[in-house]
Structures are given as structure tokens and as C-alpha cells.
Amino acid sequence: MEEADFVQKDPTGRYIRYNDVLGRGAFKTVYKAFDEVEGIEVAWNLMSIEDVLQMPGQLDRLYSEVHLLNSLKHDNIIKLFYSWVDDHNKSINMITELFTSGSLTLYRKKHRKVDPKAIMNWARQILKGLHYLHSQTPPVIHRDLKCDNIFVNGNTGKVKIGDLGLAAVMQQPTARSVIGTPEFMAPELYEEEYNELVDIYSFGMCMLEMVTCEYPYRECRNQAQIYKKVTSGIKPQSLSKVDDPQVKQFIEKCLLPAPSRPTALELLKDQLLAVDGAKDSTLTASSNTTFKPAMPPQCEYRPMDVEYKKNTSVSICSSAKSSQECALLQTMEVQRVAESTEFKLSGERRDDVAASMALRIAGSSGQARKVDFDFNLKTDTARAVTGEMVEELDLSSHEVTVIAEMIDELIMKLKANRSLPNANSVYQSKDEEAGESMKSEISADYYHRVSSNEGSRLGCCCEAVESLLSSFLDSCSMVSNKQSEDLKTELNVIESQYNQSCQRLLRMKEEAIEKAKRKWMKLS
């Protein structure tokens, strides 16, 4: 390929990009590129700023990945050579190592007959990378380790950990955000209280996939079923397909409960990974170090902290970002209380058709049920998705109704927030005032569906109605119980009719948009 074929140069003139696409992600396209100084091929990761901003949380994850890759240097961690923002083309660019053999998942599917020694070699390299991450001060947790995020050079057998966009720097003793890929997530991740040993659990699932060529929990139909099995300690069916008892025991060791789970260093010393009885010189320097996190008296905020507050959504934010930028990316949320049970549903829109949601149900006993799931905005319905959770979460018919209504409400909020990106900042203060002004019994009952930090509803008309109701309810604190009950009934009817009207309006809006798109597509 001649240099004349290149389509773009970086600001320094060192790297040139070709039009050869190596891969595509949700918001990232990877091209083949060339380093003219070193004379080597590299990967050019190109992300549209507009696409990134439209996907809540992705900007923070991208910042996290760039920040970490700049500071981490290890043979088994993917190298970042250069990164910059292109204001002219409205893009974010990263130059990284090139792995033409792709991910370990694809490589293993392509080469199904592999000697166990090769798999043990890959395992050693992954553990060395994890040992390096976990031995940082403070430790770095990958949180999304899977074979899809591990890359291989087929010519040398070198394996490297990549995709650190969800990694967390542990400034506090335990992290608290539920994030990752369900099939590879440790049980304690769902409890929102975990440390770097969650990566060891994920590594065990990677080992299982490498040995069996099968994705863990393939027998499950949805994420709710995976959640129930993981939190109940039920292992994937594919574990029974591991014939070698020593390999099976090694994998089971990785999947032990967190207090009994070994560290990366301890696994590297396992007899299964021994290289002809030789001692690995790369581990000698830190062989006497343990990495069980201690409990510091206080946590201080730093640029890469995992931000946590009770009853709020959690995200990784750069302290350099303005509050307005973070507000545009924050997760939408719906809360309800019914029959002494608290329901909390949060979600973010990943693209035009997909949304990711997290449901938490807390009973009066203090025990909580949690599940993460995806929602297709074009094909899924709230009732169908909730129906899939009945068996896994042991839901009552009343709970099914409440959750389905919450999903519908969250979808409307996500769609409205997509259409009106600044609505959150305009109306949040009004929501807070409304939440604080609930004095009467009627007000408390009516507003059980509104959270003070929910964000906007469906635009100006919704806020006007809620504002009027809030003012009216404040003036009704002295009415009789009979009048209160009658008024509550009437308000519930009004709310039901109002919500139905809002849903119809949203459907009409979507139909009009689609009609306009089709018209312009025909013209073009």
C-alpha cells in the first residue's frame, strides 16, 4: 500500500490513516494506520464527538480509558501511543497497538483445536496483566474483563488486555457501581460492594470460554436468568464440559466467594501454570506482596474517583468536567414505593434503538433484588420484558404491574431527554421544589411516583400541570379524610388519563419524524 493511499494524518505528521476498517464498535471505528517514525502498522481508533455525546456515560468511559492507558505500561496491557481531539472533524482519536488477529474470542473460534499448553500460556499473560493492574497504588479494577476485551497477536502468541473504558481506580476500599457484562460479573458486583477480586472471577469465566469455546451461561435466555444463577452460586453448564480435573479445579478456584478467591499473583504460582518447574522471574520482585484492600479512615476525591451517593446513580466522572457536561450524560431514573416495597429503575439510552436499565427492589426487611437488562426501543414491550423477570426475581402480579409502568415511564423520559437534551437542567429545580412542598397526605400519595432527582418529565406542559397540582395540594392540608380519599381517587384518574395522552403524543411525534425521514430519503 503506497503512502498516497492514506486519507488522514495526525497533527504531528507521524501517523497516517488508511481507509481499511479493522473493526467497529457502538461508537468507535478502528482503522489500519502506519507509524512513519517506527515503521510499524498501528490501529487508529476514531470516535465521532457527536456520537459519543449522544450515548450517556461514554464520554466519561472514554476519558477513563485514555487516562489509564497513558499511565499504564506493561507487556500485557495494550499500548496507547498518542491521542488527540480533532476540532475540525469533530472527532476523538487514539493510536494504539495493532492486533490483526483480533480478540481472543474470535481467535479461539477460528482455531478450535488448540493444545492446552497454549491456553495456559494465554492464561499466564492475562494474569500478569491483572497482577500489574491490581498492584497499582491505588489498585485498578478492569470490571469488564472478557475474551472480547483481550487481544492476541497470532504470529507471536502475545496476549494483551484492552478496553479499559469501564476500569475504576480504587480511591476508596470498595467500589460501588454495578457495571460490566453479566456472564462475567462476580456475585458481589450486584451487591455494589467489591474490590479487584471481581477481575479474578471474570478471569475464571475467560478460562472457561478458552477451554470450552463456549460463552458462559449460554443456556440462559436473558440477563435476569443469568443474575439469578450468579447470585445463587449456580455455575455455567459449560463447566461440566471441562474434562481435565486439574483445569476444572483451577477455574472453580477463580469462581469462589470473594473472601476465599485467590489473587492474580497466587494463581500465577499455581502448579497448573508452572513452566516446566521454572520460577517466573517477572514475579520475583513483588512475590511477597498481598493486595487485599485495607479500610482507610476516609476517602478523598481525586480526578478518577468512583463517585457514590446513596440512592443516586453512579458514574465515573472527571473532576475537570463541568457540572453541565456531566448532567447531559447522567442516567435517568424512576422511583416508586408500593406496599412497603421500594422500586428504583435507572437507565441510559445507548443509541437510537437500545437502552440499558437497572432495576432494584428493596423490601421492608432490607433485602434487595437487583437486575440489569437491555431494552430494544423498537421491538420490546414493558410487559414482555417484565414477564421474563417473574420467575427469576419471584415477582408478584402487583410488582409486575408496577415495574411495567415504571419501564414505560422511563422510556418516555429517555425519549424526551433525547429530543430535549437541555430539559434536565431547565426543570430539575422545579422537580426539587415540588418534592419538598409535599405536606398533606394526598400530596405524599400522589407524588410517590416522582423523585426529586428524576429529571424532566415530558416538556413544558408536564411541568405546568405538576406545578399547579403541587400548589393546589399544599392548600388542601386541612381537608377531611373523606374528601382526601375522593380527591386522591380523582387525581389518580387524571394522572392515568394524562399519562395515556402523553404516550399518544410521543407516538404521534415518532410517527411524524419517521414520515419526514422517509420523505427526505425519497427526495435524496
Curated annotation (Swiss-Prot):
Domain Protein kinase: 16-273
Catalytic class of the enzyme: transferase
Residues forming the catalytic site: D163 (proton acceptor)
The keyword Phosphoprotein belongs to this UniProt entry's keyword annotation: yes
Residues bound to ATP: T96, E97, L98, F99, K146
Record-linked InterPro entries: Kinase-like_dom_sf (IPR011009), Prot_kinase_dom (IPR000719), Ser/Thr_kinase_AS (IPR008271), WNK_Ser-Thr_kinase (IPR050588)
Species annotation: Arabidopsis thaliana (Mouse-ear cress)
Record's catalysed reaction(s): L-seryl-[protein] + ATP = O-phospho-L-seryl-[protein] + ADP + H(+); L-threonyl-[protein] + ATP = O-phospho-L-threonyl-[protein] + ADP + H(+)
Modified residues (Phosphoserine): S477
UniProt family annotation: Belongs to the protein kinase superfamily. Ser/Thr protein kinase family. WNK subfamily.
Keywords: ATP-binding, Coiled coil, Kinase, Nucleotide-binding, Phosphoprotein, Serine/threonine-protein kinase, Transferase
Stated name of the protein: Probable serine/threonine-protein kinase WNK10
EC number: 2.7.11.1
Signal sequence, start to end: none
